[in-house]
């Protein structure tokens, strides 16, 4: 036999449980906060409303009042207006005038005058004086005597005081569209001419050409090239002055000039010609300034070490500079030499002139030995008839080793010897290894040389 399951009975509501268990203190833990609106959600709304303003929307745990403005009813019944009824003015009664009544109606009725019993004042018939009036056609003439008063003034002329001359200008006359104004120049007092003088103190002898004041030049803005944000790099390559793009990329024939800002786009990793210009994407225009007594050529470069997805480059700033030349404190005095040579230094010689007796004649010995220096000698003159040729040798000239040249000489055993010509015509014997031929002899055509020998008969 199957057992039937017991029917589940519905639990009482929270309000019913709160009414029975509140006094006994046996209420479950969730009944009292729910009925008294003290749950976690109610506390969040209570404390959150203190710091959050909802603009008067009435959002909260309180009663719905519609905010500050309140609720507006959908349908409003206006109160009926009470109509105003004008009040009637009472009629004015007008008395009628009978035909027999007088035409002048007294405004004050006699019956309205009340006599208080005081005595009535009656004006007297005769006053204290009489006024007599008469009419006459004769005009009244008054006898008025004229009194004359004489005033005398004395004028003394002061020679130390001179009255200013008053010049009256003539009225303007218009003739042919032009206004002509003439002024009289006649004066009764002498005119003193005062020459104008300048009050400008000038250190130079020349006076200024104009009186316009020189505007004060303001302080020039200082270029911040030596701050901590810039890395200082000195460039020694001379190409930095004329064509700095050669230090970063290859030479561009469409280059505009060095006075503009240079931009460089590097799509791939590359190595510049100069390692100091690595990752340079922008090179600003040059600036020339003085730094510690030297002229300095400067440019500011921008590195593109990193770049974001949006394409913006991020990198430091570098100050590239190169010192051109020093600035001298004072002008240097350079001695000028004459351009025209004097008579002593002239290279023209008179071949017919007599030799100078003061000049000592010393024979010059020429030695062609290896590594033999020439000694300094005085100027010597070798007489050949009437011709005098001065010979001047430099000081301490070393002769490089070369070939030894031997000239043939005639025998002196006989009393008679043939005449030897001035130039050697015999064969030349060259002994040595360190010598160089003249360049034209390398490609010269070899020809057979005939050496003419001089013979003489010898008497027995």
Curated annotation (Swiss-Prot):
Highly phosphorylated. Minor protein of the capsid that localizes along the inner surface of the virion, within the central cavities beneath the L1 pentamers. Plays a role in capsid stabilization through interaction with the major capsid protein L1. Once the virion enters the host cell, L2 escorts the genomic DNA into the nucleus by promoting escape from the endosomal compartments and traffic through the host Golgi network. One of its GO terms (biological process) is symbiont entry into host cell. The keyword DNA-binding applies. Its main location: virion. InterPro entries: Late_L2 (IPR000784). Interacts with major capsid protein L1. Interacts with E2; this interaction inhibits E2 transcriptional activity but not the DNA replication function E2. Interacts with host GADD45GIP1. Interacts with host HSPA8; this interaction is required for L2 nuclear translocation. Interacts with host importins KPNB2 and KPNB3. Forms a complex with importin alpha2-beta1 heterodimers via interaction with the importin alpha2 adapter. Interacts with host DYNLT1; this interaction is essential for virus intracellular transport during entry. Keywords: Capsid protein, Cytoplasmic inwards viral transport, Disulfide bond, DNA-binding, Host endosome, Host Golgi apparatus, Host nucleus, Host-virus interaction, Late protein, Microtubular inwards viral transport, Phosphoprotein, Viral penetration into host nucleus, Virion, Virus entry into host cell. Disulfide bonds join 21-27. A motif (Nuclear localization signal) lies at residues 1-12, 443-451. One of its GO terms (cellular component) is host cell endosome. The gene is L2. One of its GO terms (molecular function) is DNA binding. Belongs to the papillomaviridae L2 protein family. This is Minor capsid protein L2. It is found in: Virion; Host nucleus; Host early endosome; Host Golgi apparatus. HAMAP family: PPV_L2.
């Amino acid at each position: 036999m199957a057992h039937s399951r017991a029917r589940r009975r519905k639990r009482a509501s929270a309000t019913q449980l709160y009414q029975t268990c509140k006094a006994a203190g046996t209420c479950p833990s969730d009944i009292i906060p729910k009925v008294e609106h003290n749950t976690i959600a109610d506390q969040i709304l209570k404390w959150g409303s203190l710091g959050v303003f909802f603009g008067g929307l009435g959002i909260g745990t309180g009663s719905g009042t519609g905010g500050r403005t309140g609720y507006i009813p959908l349908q409003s019944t206006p109160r009926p207006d009470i109509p105003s009824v004008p009040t009637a003015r009472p009629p004015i009664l007008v008395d009628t005038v009978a035909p027999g009544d007088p035409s002048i109606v007294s405004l004050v009725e006699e019956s309205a005058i009340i006599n208080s019993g005081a005595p009535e004042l009656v004006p007297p018939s005769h006053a204290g004086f009489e006024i007599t009036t008469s009419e006459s056609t004769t005009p009244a003439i008054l006898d008025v005597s004229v009194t004359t008063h004489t005033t005398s003034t004395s004028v003394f002329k002061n020679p130390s005081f001179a009255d200013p001359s008053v010049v009256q200008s003539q009225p303007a006359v218009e003739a042919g569209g032009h206004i002509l104004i003439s002024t009289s120049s006649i004066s009764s007092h002498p005119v003193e001419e005062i020459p104008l003088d300048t009050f400008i103190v000038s250190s130079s002898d020349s006076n200024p050409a104009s009186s316009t004041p020189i505007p004060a030049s303001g302080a020039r803005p200082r270029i911040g090239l030596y701050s901590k944000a810039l890395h200082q790099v000195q460039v020694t390559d001379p190409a930095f002055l004329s064509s700095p793009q050669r230090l970063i990329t290859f030479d561009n024939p469409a280059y505009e000039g060095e006075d503009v800002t240079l931009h460089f786009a590097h799509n791939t990793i590359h190595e510049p010609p100069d390692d100091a210009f690595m990752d340079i994407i922008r090179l600003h225009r040059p600036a020339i300034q003085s730094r510690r007594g030297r002229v300095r050529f400067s440019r500011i470069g921008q590195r593109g070490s990193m770049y974001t997805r949006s394409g913006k480059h991020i990198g430091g700033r570098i100050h590239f500079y190169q010192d051109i030349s020093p600035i001298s404190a004072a002008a240097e005095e350079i001695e000028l030499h004459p351009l025209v040579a004097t008579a002593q230094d002239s290279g023209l010689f008179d071949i017919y002139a007599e030799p100078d007796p003061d000049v000592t004649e010393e024979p010059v010995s020429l030695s062609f030995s290896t590594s033999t220096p020439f000694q300094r000698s005085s100027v010597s003159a070798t007489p050949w008839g009437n011709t005098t040729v001065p010979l001047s040798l430099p000081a301490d000239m070393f002769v490089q080793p070369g070939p030894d040249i031997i000239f043939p000489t005639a025998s002196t055993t006989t009393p008679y010897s043939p005449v030897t010509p001035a130039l050697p015509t015999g064969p030349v014997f060259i002994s040595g290894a360190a010598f160089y031929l003249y360049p034209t002899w390398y490609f010269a055509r070899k020809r057979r040389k005939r050496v003419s020998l001089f013979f003489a008969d010898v008497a027995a």
